[in-house]
Amino acid sequence: LHKKDNDNINGPSLIKVPDWIDNPLGKYYLYFAHHQGKYIRMAYSDKIEGPYTIYEKGTLQLSETTCKTHIASPDVHIDEGSGRIAMYYHGDVEGGQKTFISWSIDGINFLNNVVPKGEFYFRVFKYKDKFYSVAKNKNIDGVIYESDSWDGEFKPLFNLIPNIRHSAVYVKENMLFLFYSCIGDSPESIFLVKINLDSWEAVKVEKILTPKTEYEGGNLPIMKSMPGSSTLRYGRPVKELRDPYIYSEHNKLYMLYSLAGECGIGLAQLYNIGES
């Protein structure tokens, strides 16, 4: 990335490029963002673990949306039925930060829908015949939405998890595995809560990853995490993990996450998730 674009890196979302895309740049497209980004970033690779090559032009541009100063937090899905790729993202508009959806047939060029879908930091999943999303309700808590389709109206159902920042979702049978971090933790780390999707009952909460390595900020002082951009606030790496994203392939589960605050993207393989 150009120096002006690499001072903040966050919000990963990974897909395996579908077979119906001709001449892809690689087998995997990794979308990510800048907290004050003017476009959604993308890198590509032939292996999940990389190395990844930056697609310098980026994908969806701020100028192609109705947002004012930035777009970020991509959440990307393959809609096999329509042969399209859906990208949820958020940006600032009249009334605050909201989530929108854009569509692409190649994973690079996106057409935007100007109708807001809900609050920001959407992570969308499907259960039975409904679509759901977990989003951040300003800096208060999280909110669960329900919709009949990818780009339909998302109606709020209920709130959950005070101070949640960003989340990731994985569904197995009738269980939602919700990964998240929280503003105000010392240090900010990744948690997992299991939720029964038929009763919406939370079953278990556990901390699964905390900053330990140097590249995660593990050698830095413990501080209470704050809202907003870590690099804009501090101008340096901090001891925080944020922005989880879950990717599943060949019975293997991977978690991508923002490390040292918002100074890079890490990848970890998860074990024994959903076995008990």
Language-model-derived ranges and their functions:
Residues 1-73, 77-239, 248-276:
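Beta-rich carbohydrate-recognition and catalytic domains
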